């Protein structure tokens, strides 16, 4: 579902742009790429928050079929059986163990990966990559019912690392953020705001109390951190 607000009046969600039975993740990817194209001549901010991967897991049929063929069924203590999903059954009614290789989850992740690639390619094509901060992250760890966060303990809705430790990838070419480097310094999503302010040379509003701190120096020199 896309909830229409004053901020997205321009988005015509009733128009089918990708043919019959368009897939939501693909549509959001398309809208994001089109947004960049429309705003290429001026500063823009794009926040793309995918619904996937989220239960109930439903991947795009052609990708689900791809992953059905790619892996044999495994053993798992995780529920949410994709065989029940394929049969159109209520996931909550499943009482047996699910195979470990869930093609629906894999398919949903591939759709997100494709969208990230499309956005990065569009920025490159328009010559905007060096002047665009591209951040990839997530809101929480994986749900224990459908995946495993091992070797981290716990998962979504838990304060163990499996619930709160998420990916963070920053792409900002032109020597601003070195490619292929990693950093073990713990940061939190609250740090994004002060970090972006510093990156854009904007002074914080003195009336605001910032929960995070700028990590821009860590982005630029991750090895030192």
Give the label of every model feature segment.
Residues 214-225:
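Short, intrinsically disordered, charge-balanced linker/junction segments flanking boundaries
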Residues 1-193, 197-213:
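Active-site-proximal cap/lid insertion segments
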């Amino acid at each position: 579902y896309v909830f229409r607000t004053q901020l997205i009046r321009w988005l015509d969600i009733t128009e089918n742009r990708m043919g019959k039975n368009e897939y939501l993740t693909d549509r959001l990817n398309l809208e994001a790429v089109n947004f960049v194209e429309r705003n290429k001549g001026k500063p823009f901010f794009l926040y793309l928050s995918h619904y996937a991967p989220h239960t109930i897991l439903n991947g795009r049929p052609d990708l689900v079929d791809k992953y059905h063929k790619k892996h044999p069924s495994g053993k798992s203590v995780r529920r949410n059986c994709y065989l029940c999903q394929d049969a159109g059954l209520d996931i909550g009614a499943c009482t047996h163990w699910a195979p470990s290789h869930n093609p629906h989850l894999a398919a949903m992740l591939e759709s997100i990966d494709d969208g990230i690639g499309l956005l990065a390619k569009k920025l490159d094509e328009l010559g905007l990559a060096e002047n665009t901060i591209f951040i990839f992250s997530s809101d929480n760890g994986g749900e224990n019912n459908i995946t495993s966060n091992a070797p981290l303990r716990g998962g979504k809705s838990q304060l163990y690392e499996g619930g709160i430790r998420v990916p963070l990838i920053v792409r900002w070419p032109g020597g601003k953020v070195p490619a292929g480097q990693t950093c073990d310094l713990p940061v939190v999503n609250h740090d994004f705001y002060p970090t972006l302010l510093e990156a854009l040379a904007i002074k914080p509003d003195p009336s605001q109390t910032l929960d995070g701190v700028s990590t821009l120096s860590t982005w630029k020199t991750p090895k030192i951190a």
